[in-house]
Amino acid sequence: MTIAIGQKQDRGVFDLIDDWLKRDRFVFVGWSGLLLFPCAFLAVGGWLTGITFVTSWYTHGLASSFLEGCNFLTAAVSTPANSMGHSLLLLWGPEAQGDITRWFQIGGLWTFVALHGSFGVIGFCLRQFEIARLVGIRPYNAIAFSGPIAVFVTVFLVYPLGQASWFFAPSFGVAAIFRFLLFLQGFHNWTLNPFHMMGVAGILGGALLCAIHGATVENTLFEDGDAANTFRAFTPTQSEETYSMVTANRFWSQIFGVAFSNKRWLHFFMLFVPVAGMWTSAIGIVGLALNLRAYDFVSQELRAAEDPEFETFYTKNNLLNEGIRSWMAAQDQPHENFIFPEEVLPRGNAL
């Protein structure tokens, strides 16, 4: 028998906190949880409060809460008024001066939800890093989640920072996001932006890869169980492979002439395509924040202006964008006092 004699190490406060945070429990907390849980709770709570009770009458001239008659698709937490610029709109700041009713009226809840939501999604990414390290696996889940973080931060924070105020960010609501998409198309011709094209290719390509991969795995399952369906035929502790990569490779080689030769390259490609799509679209939004133009085919515009018989899909889309601008601007930005001919102005429900 060996007896080790030594001095007991003193455990500091940091070690005690570290042990408590990383204790095995139903919901892991961790150091990342100190950022994630409070921020996520406040962001979701602020959003639910806003769509339930808070009006957008003072910032947008709109009804935006359940209390005013909106439903889940039309309710939103609206952006602050344009006159507020890029102020953080703190409850105790010079705008609200501690008056929570005034803070709701000027749109302070939007900055509250946007900032806490941003830190919340960053905390969730850090949580995946932390747990991956503790479990002993690679951190590719966290790397993949960097895509949604990039999109959220660029759309809700970077884009309005490049514009005149928070007013031009999307409000937190379904119909409000649709309005923002129309705004991006009308004022930035977003659908013709190559970064948007790469983003769409990445997201739809990722969905296609998921569908193909799932179907291929189902098609090549080893029949080593007697149960009637997939979910009962295998045990989670089985040591053998679930499906045949060799058979899958042979199938797709016959379909396309080429196929993935190993699982590592296959799954890395499935990771890369959608994440690259999200990152490229985020880069495109940064360009919009700086009002950079993407594709402007001026030669076609000039020829269409000179020749009434010459028209392309590009020139037709340009006319649609002009219509969006003239229809949206007067209603969406009443503080600018835009004046348009009466025949092109929106006519409410009489359309």
UniProtKB/Swiss-Prot annotation:
Family per record: Belongs to the reaction center PufL/M/PsbA/D family.
CDD domains cross-referenced by the UniProt entry: Photosystem-II_D2
Enzyme class: oxidoreductase
SUPFAM superfamilies named among the record's database cross-references: Bacterial photosystem II reaction centre, L and M subunits
Residues that bind pheophytin a: Q128, N141
One annotated Gene Ontology cellular component of this protein: photosystem II
Positions bound to Fe cation: H213, H267
Native organism: Emiliania huxleyi (Coccolithophore)
Transmembrane segments annotated in the record for this chain: 39-59, 123-139, 151-164, 206-226, 277-293
UniProt catalytic activity: 2 a plastoquinone + 4 hnu + 2 H2O = 2 a plastoquinol + O2
Other remarks on this protein: 2 of the reaction center chlorophylls (ChlD1 and ChlD2) are entirely coordinated by water.
InterPro entries: D1/D2, Photo_II_D1/D2_sf, Photo_RC_L/M, Photo_RC_L/M_CS, PSII_PsbD/D2
Membrane topology: Multi-pass membrane protein
Binding residue positions for chlorophyll a PD2: H196
Amino-acid positions noted as binding a plastoquinone in the UniProt annotation, renumbered to this chain: H213, F260
Catalytic activity, EC: 1.10.3.9
Disulfide bond sites: none
Keywords annotated in UniProt: Chlorophyll, Chloroplast, Chromophore, Electron transport, Iron, Magnesium, Membrane, Metal-binding, Oxidoreductase, Photosynthesis, Photosystem II, Plastid, Thylakoid, Transmembrane, Transmembrane helix, Transport
Co-factor remark: The D1/D2 heterodimer binds P680, chlorophylls that are the primary electron donor of PSII, and subsequent electron acceptors. It shares a non-heme iron and each subunit binds pheophytin, quinone, additional chlorophylls, carotenoids and lipids. There is also a Cl(-1) ion associated with D1 and D2, which is required for oxygen evolution. The PSII complex binds additional chlorophylls, carotenoids and specific lipids.
Name used for this protein in its record: Photosystem II D2 protein
Subunit field text: PSII is composed of 1 copy each of membrane proteins PsbA, PsbB, PsbC, PsbD, PsbE, PsbF, PsbH, PsbI, PsbJ, PsbK, PsbL, PsbM, PsbT, PsbX, PsbY, PsbZ, Psb30/Ycf12, at least 3 peripheral proteins of the oxygen-evolving complex and a large number of cofactors. It forms dimeric complexes.
Role noted for this protein: Photosystem II (PSII) is a light-driven water:plastoquinone oxidoreductase that uses light energy to abstract electrons from H(2)O, generating O(2) and a proton gradient subsequently used for ATP formation. It consists of a core antenna complex that captures photons, and an electron transfer chain that converts photonic excitation into a charge separation. The D1/D2 (PsbA/PsbD) reaction center heterodimer binds P680, the primary electron donor of PSII as well as several subsequent electron acceptors. D2 is needed for assembly of a stable PSII complex.
Compartment list: Plastid, Chloroplast thylakoid membrane
GO MF terms, alphabetically ordered: chlorophyll binding; electron transporter, transferring electrons within the cyclic electron transport pathway of photosynthesis activity; iron ion binding; oxidoreductase activity
Positions of chlorophyll a ChlzD2 binding: H116
